[in-house]
């Protein structure tokens, strides 16, 4: 469990099977990191909108928040691009148990990086007032 101040988060051991950026059918930029958990289940982590709607331009545009989230994912997992994430063993932090487990962050294993600090998605959003 990870103490985040008010709440305790669970963590689950996982292996990344696939990771990519995509633009959804509604033209929303997001990331997905797919993992297999130690106990045998699988899950997609992400689906977080990395861009924003510009009312003046009447279209979606890039955002500082989205750029920072991508940057932090790459730095946290010690890779240069999303394709290098495949095969990495990570901790997935989240709330809930079993099928109701909701991922809220991730980190490398300490054996891979003794200084590994978790990337908690809501912490990055809070830095940008989101």
Please annotate each region the language model reported.
Residues 1-130:
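Short beta-rich binding modules
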């Amino acid at each position: 469990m990870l103490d985040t101040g008010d709440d305790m988060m669970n963590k689950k051991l996982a292996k990344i099977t696939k990771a990519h950026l995509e633009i959804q059918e509604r033209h929303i930029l997001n990331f997905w990191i797919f993992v297999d958990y130690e106990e045998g289940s699988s899950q997609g982590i992400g689906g977080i909108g990395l861009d924003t709607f510009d009312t003046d331009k009447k279209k979606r545009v890039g955002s500082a928040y989205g750029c920072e989230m991508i940057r932090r994912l790459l730095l946290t997992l010690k890779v240069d691009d999303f394709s290098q994430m495949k095969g990495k063993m990570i901790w997935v932090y989240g709330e809930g148990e079993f099928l109701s487990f909701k991922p809220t962050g991730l980190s490398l294993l300490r054996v891979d990086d003794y200084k590994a600090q978790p990337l908690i998605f809501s912490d990055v959003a809070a830095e940008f007032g989101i």
